[in-house]
């Protein structure tokens, strides 16, 4: 039996690594993509994933990535993100452009190719596939010194909303996940005086899985996750 494929773009050592482990455990053939594919070697060995070098801001790279996928693409996670901080008067326009290319345009290219592939697939229990966008609270409200990140995440959220309304009736589940808080990562633990102040990547991954498993009679288009101590 051919395994379903779960693609994770913008893969690395944080949340995307937790997603890769989870989808592999769930029986998916995992495909990891990043600009620097070399950094994914150990994760690929651990999960049995295939690895592809891909610049998500390059349309040809993204097309080649999807063309190389073997098997039914049931999950695509658009995980690219770029953060540029600074006072609005001091920001370098080229740095801002590059950040928007990664977060907004990169999400568009990945979402577009995922939709193209899934629309051609036979549905399974009425569902052709699931496309998930990793968002942030910056896609809901802008913060000082963080305009480029907010611009990218607002654009990504708008993309996800448009795709949800267009593709849900065609059997493709699209959702945007607002990750409202910092994520525990190797080398980035929460302060001793602020226990439970960061999100556990394994717990976030379970939310992604729940979205994939949602019955189409009750699909979520947006969902927020945050630490229980977070003020919002």
Where are these regions (language model features)?
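A short, exposed helix-loop element centered on a Lys and neighboring polar residues
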Residues: 111-112, 161
């Amino acid at each position: 039996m051919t395994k379903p494929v779960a693609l994770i773009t913008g893969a690395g050592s944080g949340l995307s690594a937790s997603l890769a482990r989870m989808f592999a455990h769930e029986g998916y053939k995992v495909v990891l993509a990043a600009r620097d594919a070399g950094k994914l070697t150990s994760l690929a060995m651990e999960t049995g994933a295939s690895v592809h070098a891909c610049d998500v801001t390059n349309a040809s790279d993204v097309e080649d990535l999807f063309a190389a996928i073997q098997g039914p693409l049931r999950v695509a996670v658009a995980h690219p993100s770029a953060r540029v901080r600074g006072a609005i008067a001091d920001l370098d326009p080229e740095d801002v452009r590059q950040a928007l290319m990664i977060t907004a345009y990169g999400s568009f290219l990945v979402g577009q190719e995922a939709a193209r592939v899934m629309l051609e697939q036979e549905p399974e229990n009425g569902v052709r596939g699931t496309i998930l966008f990793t968002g942030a609270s910056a896609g809901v409200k802008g913060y000082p010194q963080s305009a480029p990140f907010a611009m990218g995440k607002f654009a990504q959220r708008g993309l996800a909303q448009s795709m949800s309304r267009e593709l849900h009736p065609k059997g493709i589940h699209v959702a945007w996940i607002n990750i409202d808080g910092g994520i525990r990562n190797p080398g980035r633990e929460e302060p001793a005086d602020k226990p439970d102040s960061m999100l556990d990547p394994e717990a976030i991954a379970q939310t992604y899985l729940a979205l994939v498993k949602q019955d189409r009679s009750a699909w979520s288009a947006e969902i927020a996750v945050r630490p229980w101590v977070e003020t919002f």
